[in-house]
């Protein structure tokens, strides 16, 4: 996402001290932390060289808390106190948590379910905070200093409660959240898709326990998630289970002990992972009773086992396309996320569905964290070599809209701190006006023609009223990403229309400097031009209102009065397009003076009509 370095014209950009910020993929199965080092995003590893941190936390009766691989190893022995896949419970209610089928004792609590453990009742926020704290400590150990903040990724379908729960967990872990970033958007950023002009992309995310598919539309630097889909009960674990069932069939009818089932499952996972690089893989294990599992699993056999599961993911992908109103041919690229996408059968099926080779250059386990790291580095204010943009939390150029006469009404002035929101009321220009065109512009000049056009949209459904009676509230809101949303709402009916745009898209430092310099150099001429346009608008409004008044109540004037008003009206109509502000002002003043008595008589007639047939006590 192109963001901008902002400085006053003529001011040299001051060198910035590098600030440490990280990207965190808080995953259902595994979590990672990444940072930009030597201009390249990379995943940070622990002291043992491991990048992936299993998202598992064990709460021991003696008060000890074990996190990661050691906790996961105790899951079978201590399932009630070893919390895995806690991400599923973030921001969820008791009923939603119980529906997951997880083996925990859930407790109802205001706002969010809690889990009963050997160390008492804990919320998913507290459990997630334990995982985030380990990642924060890892980052500070590797980078050698404190962090200024983190970008944390969340599924695109997370609602407000789930997103707030993620923020709360980060705060408990001592992390300053720079941004919550949608996981598919993070993956797209890692591949540099945000630098493309526009396009529509699919993100196919097959993790250990869940499958998500997202359709992203990139328009002028703005990523929009247009559709999501998936299956929260489908992931790499299900492929392992299919292999383990295949293996168990060779062991006879005798039931397997729980420990043996786990042993076979571990062997199945090893075989699946080996098949990502080989045409066949050994499937071997020794059971507690001495029986031996000794098979060779071929790629063809595995593909037959995997076919129903792969088909389920493709069905979800087709459904997401339908929801987005798109065809397969509309997709410009497919990003693969999640360790399970290493399977050749998955990559081939996805490529056949979308008719294009999926993007697989980056490690699918790491791609989301890498994209988050790039975003975090940008938000921290660090400049990569060769880049001319830097995020500063201010508006570089004023934002406003076009009013009558081609004038700019500034809503948010330049250098306003973001995020920011401003609202202003506008009204109609003509009687019975049922629609209003909203033209959003950017710049410091007084005339729309000298500013940068950002977007246009129409508000329809304004109830018929006399000119100036309708009240349309226009709200400009710029979020922390620099994304501008403009909403126009008619106050009496509630009808509204809106548009979103990235004001910084396609705007360089040089162009900002030029626009600011032009506004200074042309300040006097712009002021004169604005004054002329305002006089012309006033003239048009007066001419239209006088014509309407004459049509309705012209009988209130005698012949001489009508002749004078008509002459002044004709002069004002001729002057309304003149280039001399003084001449326009004089014509307006002359017409106003000629119609003062006429306006008073019209008011008297209106009052008499309103009071006709009413008693004095009714009026009081």
Swiss-Prot record:
It comes from the Bacteria. PROSITE patterns: HSP70_1, HSP70_2, HSP70_3. One of its GO terms (biological process) is iron-sulfur cluster assembly. Keywords: ATP-binding, Chaperone, Nucleotide-binding. Transmembrane segments: none annotated. One of its GO terms (molecular function) is ATP binding. Chaperone involved in the maturation of iron-sulfur cluster-containing proteins. Has a low intrinsic ATPase activity which is markedly stimulated by HscB. Belongs to the heat shock protein 70 family. This is Chaperone protein HscA homolog. The lineage of its organism: Bacteria, Pseudomonadati, Pseudomonadota, Betaproteobacteria, Burkholderiales.
């Amino acid at each position: 996402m192109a963001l901008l370095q902002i400085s006053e014209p003529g001011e040299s950009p001051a060198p910035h001290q590098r600030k440490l910020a990280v990207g965190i993929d808080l995953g259902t199965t595994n979590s990672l932390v990444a940072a930009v080092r030597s201009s390249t995003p990379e995943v940070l590893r622990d002291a043992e060289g491991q990048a992936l941190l299993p998202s598992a936390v064990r709460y021991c009766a003696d008060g000890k808390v074990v996190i990661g691989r050691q906790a996961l190893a105790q899951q079978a022995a201590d399932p009630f106190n070893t919390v895995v896949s806690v991400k599923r419970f973030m921001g969820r209610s008791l009923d939603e948590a119980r529906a997951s089928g997880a083996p925990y004792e859930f407790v109802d609590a205001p706002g969010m379910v809690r889990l009963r453990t050997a160390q008492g009742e804990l919320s998913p926020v507290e459990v997630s905070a334990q995982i985030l704290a380990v990642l924060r400590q890892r980052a500070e150990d590797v980078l050698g200093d404190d962090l200024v903040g983190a970008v944390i990724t969340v599924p695109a379908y997370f609602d407000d409660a789930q997103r707030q729960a993620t923020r709360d967990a980060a705060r408990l872990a001592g992390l300053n959240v720079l941004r919550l970033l949608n996981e598919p958007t993070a993956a797209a950023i890692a591949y540099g898709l945000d630098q493309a002009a526009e396009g529509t992309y699919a993100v196919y995310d097959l993790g250990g326990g869940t499958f998500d598919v997202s359709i992203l539309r990139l328009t002028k630097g703005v990523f929009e998630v247009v559709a999501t889909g998936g299956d929260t009960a489908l992931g790499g674990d299900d492929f392992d289970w299919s292999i383990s069932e295949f293996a168990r069939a060779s062991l006879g009818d005798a039931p397997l002990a729980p420990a043996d089932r786990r042993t076979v499952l571990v062997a199945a996972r090893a075989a699946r992972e080996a098949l990502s690089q080989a045409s066949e893989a050994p499937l071997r294990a020794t059971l507690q009773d001495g029986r031996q599992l000794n098979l060779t699993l071929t790629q063809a056999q595995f593909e037959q086992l995997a076919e129903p599961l792969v088909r389920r993911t493709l069905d979800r992908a087709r459904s997401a396309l339908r929801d987005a109103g798109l065809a397969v041919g509309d997709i410009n690229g497919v990003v693969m996320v999640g360790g399970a996408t290493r399977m050749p059968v998955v990559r081939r099926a996805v490529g056949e569905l979308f008719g294009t080779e999926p993007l697989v250059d980056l490690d699918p386990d790491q791609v989301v964290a890498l994209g988050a790291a790039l975003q975090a580095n940008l938000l921290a204010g660090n400049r990569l070599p060769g880049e001319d943009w830097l995020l500063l939390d201010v508006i570089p150029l004023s934002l406003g809209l076009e009013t009558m006469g081609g004038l700019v009404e500034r809503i948010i002035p330049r250098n306003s701190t973001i995020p920011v929101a401003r609202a202003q009321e506008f009204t109609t220009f003509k009687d019975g006006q049922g629609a209003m065109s909203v033209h959003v512009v950017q710049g410091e000049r007084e005339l729309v023609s000298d500013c940068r056009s950002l977007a246009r949209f129409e508000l329809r459904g304004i109830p018929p009223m006399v000119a100036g009676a309708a009240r349309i509230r226009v709200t400009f809101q710029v979020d922390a990403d620099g994304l501008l949303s403009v909403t126009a709402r008619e106050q009496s009916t509630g009808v509204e229309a809106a548009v979103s745009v990235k004001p910084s898209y396609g705007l360089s430092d040089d162009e900002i400097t030029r626009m600011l310099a032009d506004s200074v150099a042309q300040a006097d001429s712009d002021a004169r031009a604005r004054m002329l346009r305002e006089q012309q608008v006033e003239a048009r409004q007066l001419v239209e209102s006088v014509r309407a008044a004459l049509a309705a109540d012209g009988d209130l004037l005698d012949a001489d009065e009508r002749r004078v008003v008509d002459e002044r009206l004709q002069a004002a109509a001729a002057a309304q397009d003149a280039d001399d502000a003084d001449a326009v002002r004089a014509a307006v003043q002359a017409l106003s003076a000629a119609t003062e008595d006429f306006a008073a008589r019209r008011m008297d007639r209106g009052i008499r009509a309103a009071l006709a047939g009413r008693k004095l006590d009714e009026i009081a």
